[in-house]
């Protein structure tokens, strides 16, 4: 399937598609700890801030349909963390386990290295075994777990921290 996939920088025209992907996971999983859907203006502002801060938003498309996206932001908003980022990656729920995530992450790694990023952090709900295994396959290591740090769907949630040195 990877022959049909195009990986490129997101444009403003992709925002609604990215929004649909994110909002699906907000509504249907603990992959994202938000309770309420993101509105398009919030994502447009995030997109514009990413451009201003030279932080990528990368999309995967098949036949001009956005099937996944990946991005990163500085891990903490303090100068001492300027070489550390936390990433997000989501694939459309009908397009998981098809190699799209790996293509997105490979491009994200290239972007991070080009921006002199030293390390990338993944914060993953401990019940999301597929994402944990995916990150292991990419070379991330498990560095810890935050116990009962989140709360969603009437339950406390643990978050795994994973890291890769680039």
Indicate residue ranges for each PLM-predicted region.
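A short beta-loop-alpha structural element at the N-terminal edge
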Residues: 5-20
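Helix-loop element at the rim of GNAT/NAT acetyltransferase active sites that forms part
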Residues: 20-37, 50
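Acetyl-CoA-dependent GNAT
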Residues: 35-94, 105, 165
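Conserved catalytic-core motifs of GNAT/GCN5-like acyltransferases
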Residues: 74, 121-124, 136, 141-158
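Active-site acidic-Proline motif in GNAT/NAT acetyltransferases
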Residues: 89-94, 98, 110, 126-127
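Conserved acetyl-CoA-binding loop-helix of GNAT-fold acetyltransferases
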Residues: 97-110, 133-137
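Conserved GNAT acetyl-CoA-binding A-motif
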Residues: 112-124
């Amino acid at each position: 399937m990877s022959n049909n996939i195009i990986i490129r920088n997101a444009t403003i025209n992709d925002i609604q598609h990215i929004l649909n992907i994110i909002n699906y996971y907000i509504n249907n999983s603990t992959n994202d700890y938000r309770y309420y859907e993101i509105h398009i203006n919030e994502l447009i502002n995030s997109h514009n801030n990413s451009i201003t801060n030279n932080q990528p938003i990368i999309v995967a498309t098949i036949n001009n349909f956005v099937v996944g996206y990946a991005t990163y932001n500085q891990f903490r908003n303090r100068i001492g963390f300027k070489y550390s980022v936390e990433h997000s990656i989501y694939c459309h729920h009908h397009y998981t386990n098809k190699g799209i995530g790996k293509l997105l992450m490979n491009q994200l790694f290239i972007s991070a290295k080009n921006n002199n990023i030293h390390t990338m952090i993944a914060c993953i709900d401990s019940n999301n075994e597929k994402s944990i295994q995916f990150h292991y396959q990419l070379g991330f290591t498990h560095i810890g777990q935050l116990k009962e740090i989140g709360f969603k769907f009437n339950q406390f949630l643990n978050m795994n921290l994973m890291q890769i040195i680039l």
